[in-house]
Amino acid sequence: IEIISLVFVLFFFFLIGFVDDSIGLSATKKIILYFIITFIFVKLNSRFEIHSLNFYLFETKDIKNISIYFTCFCIISLIIAVDLMDGINLTTSIFLLSKLLIVYFTFEEMIFQKQLILFLIVPLILFLFFNAKGKVYLGTGGTCVLAFFISLIIIDKANNYPNLLSATHILALLL
């Protein structure tokens, strides 16, 4: 169910972005749609839910009561931030590429996921070339899909390696 729901979510995020780029959607409608899609995905895949915040020098803060809402907030915040950066050439692609490279080199033992991350890194590097010349841009559909995917990778790593990534590191990586 995880792969199927991921494909549907990525499709719906791309569809929202495509509609927004084509005819335009209000910010309120987009945020509501982002929340509904993200909420359903996280509810179906609790692996991507942030259950606690691990502060580096302090105690772990349990947020089980609001964890799904906090997770949705983090994911949607990244999507909106990346979408806002898309208007300036190279900004979005360099930002996303840097996040992917950080995750790629931080978690060396995850071979399959490293290949998946490479699957995103290589096209982004090629995209940089054309984006620098102003020939192409990601658009809302591309930024939504990539931002959502990167947020899932970071949340998954944070849940599996709580000592390596504290809550402050997660938020710094996301924003």
Region locations from a protein language model:
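N-terminal transmembrane signal-anchor/hairpin module of polytopic inner-membrane proteins
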Residues: 1-58, 62-63, 70, 163-175
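Alpha-helical transmembrane segments
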Residues: 4-15, 81, 90-175
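Divalent metal-coordination and catalytic microenvironments
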Residues: 21, 86, 140
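Short, highly charged low-complexity linear segments
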Residues: 45-52, 73-77, 134-137, 158-162
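Unusually extended, aromatic-enriched hydrophobic runs near protein termini
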Residues: 53-70, 86, 122, 128-134
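Function-critical hydrophobic alpha-helical transmembrane segments in multi-pass membrane proteins
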Residues: 66-82, 88-92
